[in-house]
Amino acid sequence: TAPLSEAEISIVRKHVSEGMEMLKGCEGVHPDVADIVAHHHERYNGSGYPRQLKNDQIPVFARIAGIIDTYDAMINDRPFAAAVAPADVIARLYTMRDVDFQAELIEEFIQTIGIYPAGSLVELTNGEVGVVVCESRKRRLRPKILLLLDSAKQALKETRYINLLETTHDARDRPLEILKGLDPGAYGLDPEELLI
C-alpha cells in the first residue's frame, strides 16, 4: 500500500469531470444529483477539488456526500491504504470538523450511523470478538453482536448472538461492553463475508 503518485492522483481526480460528462447524456437528472457528482470532493476549508470551493459555496448535498464518500473509502481497502475500523474512522472524521467538513454535518452523520455501525468488528471487555449486526437507536454503544471468537481468540464451536442492551454483565458478573473496534480483517475475520 504505497501512496499514489502525482500522475495517479491526476487520473483519480478526472472521475468528477467524467461523471459530469456522463450526466449530460441523461435526461431528468435532478440538479442536486449533478451538484453531488460535481462537488463531492470539495472541502469546507477550500482544499478540495475540482474548484476549491469552501464553506457554503459547496452545495449542502455535496457536503453530505463528501462525508459519506470519505467514510466509505476509509472503511474499505484501497490500493494505497488498508481499511480502517469504523470507530477509528468516526474519530478521524470528528477531527475534520470545520476543516474538511462542516461540523454540524459531521456530528449529524455520527449520530446517524453510530460509533459501531452494523458490520463493525468489535472486541468485548471479556475478550470475545464479534461483528455488530444491529444497532440500538436508544443506546448506540450497546448493539446486538454476532460472537465469533472466545476470549482466547479461538473460533466458537457455535456462533451466538448477544444483545448488549439485555446482557450487561459477563459470566463472572463483570460489566460487559465493547472494549474497542477492530480493523477489518483482524483475526482473519472479514465482516463483509460474515454478514452476507
Question: Can you name each region flagged by the protein language model?
Answer:
Residues T1-I196:
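Histidine- and acidic-residue-rich, metal-dependent catalytic cores
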